Amino acid sequence: MNYANFGLDFLNSVANAAVEGKKLDLASRGLQLRSRALDTERDFNYAKLAFERHKFDTNNDLRIYGDAMRIQALRAAGLRINPYSNGRQIYQDEADLANLHSYYSFYKTD
């Protein structure tokens, strides 16, 4: 048995083990970064879906209940055209004004 070769082989195996350990460490860090990037992308996509759902629900509510909601908001703000109104019914002129207001506030952008 050649002790010089044994020592060189031993040092070579230790160096190879250190190199392989470093490769594994770098690979695990790469996987961690990739996993973190995928988690971030997933969270972003979930947030985007939640925002799109909220926007759809809001637009759907405005499409269905929009005029009634706007009239309620105008009534709550104290808008009363008819001085004889008791506050429990909406007259046609109030509905017309509410629709005109909704047209200019929600559909006109300039």
Curated annotation (Swiss-Prot):
> Chief localization class?
virion
* GO cellular component terms given for this protein: host cell cytoplasm; viral capsid, decoration
The record's listing under InterPro entries reads: Vesivirus_VP2 (IPR007996)
TM ranges = none
Q: Where in the cell is it found?
A: Virion; Host cytoplasm
UniProt keywords, alphabetically: Capsid decoration protein, Capsid protein, Host cytoplasm, Virion
Q: Name the Pfam families for this protein.
A: Vesi_VP2
Protein origin, superkingdom: Viruses
Q: What else is known?
A: Translated by a ribosomal termination-reinitiation process from the bicistronic mRNA coding for VP1 and VP2.
Spell out the subunit comment. Answer: Homooligomer. The portal-like structure consists in 12 copies of VP2. Interacts with capsid protein VP1.
Q: What family is this protein classified in? A: Belongs to the vesivirus VP2 protein family.
UniProt comment concerning the protein's domains: The N-terminus domain points away from the virion surface.
What is known about what this protein does? Minor structural protein that forms a portal-like structure at a unique three-fold axis of symmetry, following binding to the host receptor. The channel formed by VP2 may allow the delivery of the viral genome through the host endosomal membrane.
Protein name, as recorded: Minor capsid protein VP2
Specify the species.
Vesicular exanthema of swine virus serotype A48 (isolate Swine/United States/A48/1948)
